[in-house]
């Protein structure tokens, strides 16, 4: 990247020989402390950079509201009683699993002493190998269209929603 943007103020992840967690903390501290034009990190490090517990709570609540809207839509529009029960049960199970997973992440982050990704002042994300972030959770009345979702896709969704909401960007 330096050959393409020689005058750019950029931070590139490097390994110092200390633990990966220490390297990641150092990188997050540098990213938060300076006004970088470009920060380059590996996919694994990006995934380990968590959002703040407060933002994750907001995200969790927003997604749970989406689940509730889907459940209400089924209740209001599904004519067949058996189909209504089956779809409601399936969505409630997905909702409960999502909520449990998010609560575990929030608890883990709350106990940690890490700098959250949302304090790094980043305002744009470019993802190489985007196919690694596929399979975001999807709720549907049709079981074949419903998707459980991957943690990696959810992590990227959290960060992109943050940028869209906080920064007003449409990334």
Pin down the residues of each PLM region.
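Glycine-rich helix-loop-beta junction characteristic of Rossmann-like nucleotide cofactor-binding loops
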Residues: 163-165
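SF2 helicase/translocase NTPase motor core
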Residues: 1-160
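A short helix->loop->beta-strand "cap" motif at the edges of active sites that frequently abuts
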Residues: 122, 167-171
